[in-house]
């Protein structure tokens, strides 16, 4: 519990340091079932009820109909229910043959991201919270330097004018090792994923 409070303080610091959340925000979380998104639901779900700024959180789980694995949707819903958060399931798919220049992992990620924007708009959200942590941000920086020769990574806050939406990363100051320990403490149930495309990913 002390560790959870420590992580909450890091999330609080990120919220105020980067202006991630303000009063009246309605925020969508995409819950994949991994430890990072489960922790994000716990952190923002709790914070939305007892701390300022006051904001609303809704949770969605995106099912890719052409990927042969399924998460335990009842379990994911129970994690949202614990904080009194609305939970929605959205099903979509992608066709890997439409653009052979792009990897299936890219197309899947892009399709999920587009679905998040559509769901956020449908439910009146003005922000989408992603579960990237400090290690993800540093890894992206290194990958961009190695593969593209450019210095750049995922910002804590990104305004998407095209979609009239903001992407926020409230766990940008949180180390992955702390999230791993929280997952054990909270007893997060590991979701089994066997993606046929995962061996081709560079991450």
List the predicted regions and their residue ranges.
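ATP-dependent adenylation/nucleotidyltransferase module used to activate substrates
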Residues: 1-142, 147-150, 155-156, 177-185
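Metal-dependent de-N-acetylase/amidase catalytic core
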Residues: 153-154, 159-191, 196
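RNase H-like two-metal-ion nuclease catalytic core shared by retroviral integrases
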Residues: 198-203
